[in-house]
């Protein structure tokens, strides 16, 4: 990484076994920042979920994204014939891998959060014993904002919260709790700055 990364709450990040890492999303750097939290030995099992339509449209980007970064390409719209959209994510979790997912669905404006979609709640319902780790990232949206190609070095802050589990909550209730937790992490960051 060219930017510096300050981390709070590293002790909350599981580095073995399956987990679902969830964060706000303002930049392509977000994925690299989250991957940098793990030891090199774990990286082959850290799998970012990424938009198929964006990362698979160019064969060079597709190759790099799948073979170097290890993305799980996910189609935003799936026909019934194509099966369950989360099938490859389920397989990764069953194999003890770490999933990185951004519940806003796509990158937003720098330092602004959009409402969360319910995908993580579906995963957490299917895998109730897998920890859902909430993370707030600040600064990546300034370093490499959406739509920009020029990187500007900034300090990027990462605040990791305690894991959440979904035993019997509705998708809507769990999503609201997860979103509130990441907003709380944002407030914690702002109070200390």
Question: What feature does the model see in each segment?
Answer:
Residues 15-78:
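Catalytic core of membrane glycerolipid acyltransferases/transacylases, capturing the structured
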Residues 1-25, 94:
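Helix-to-loop junction immediately C-terminal to a conserved catalytic motif
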Residues 98, 110-172:
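A cross-family acyltransferase "interaction/gating" segment
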Residues 1-2, 76-80, 111:
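Short, flexible loop segments at the rims of nucleotide/cofactor-binding pockets, characterized by
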Residues 17-18, 44, 95-97, 130:
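Short coil/turn segments at beta-strand junctions that form active-site/ligand-binding loops
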Residues 1-4, 57-69, 144, 148-153:
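Alpha-helical membrane-targeting segments
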Residues 22, 29-37, 51-52, 57, ...:
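N-terminal/domain-start segments enriched in small and hydrophobic, helix-friendly residues
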């Amino acid at each position: 990484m060219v930017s510096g990364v300050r981390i709070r709450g590293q002790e909350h990040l599981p580095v073995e076994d399956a987990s679902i890492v969830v964060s706000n999303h303002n930049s392509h750097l977000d994925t690299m920042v989250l991957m940098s939290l793990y030891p090199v030995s774990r990286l082959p099992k850290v799998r970012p979920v990424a938009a198929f339509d964006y990362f698979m449209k160019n064969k060079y980007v597709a190759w790099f994204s799948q073979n170097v970064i290890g993305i799980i390409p996910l189609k935003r719209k799936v026909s019934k014939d194509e099966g369950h959209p989360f099938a490859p994510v389920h397989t990764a979790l069953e194999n003890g891998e770490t999933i990185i997912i951004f519940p806003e669905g796509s990158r937003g404006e720098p330092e602004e959060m959009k409402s969360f979609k319910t995908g993580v709640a579906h995963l957490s319902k299917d895998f109730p014993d897998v920890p859902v780790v909430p993370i707030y990232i600040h600064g990546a949206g300034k370093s490499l904002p959406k739509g920009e190609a020029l990187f500007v070095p900034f300090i990027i802050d990462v605040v990791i919260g305690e894991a959440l589990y979904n035993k019997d909550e509705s998708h809507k209730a769990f999503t609201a709790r997860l979103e509130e937790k990441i907003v709380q992490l944002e407030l914690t960051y702002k109070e200390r700055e």
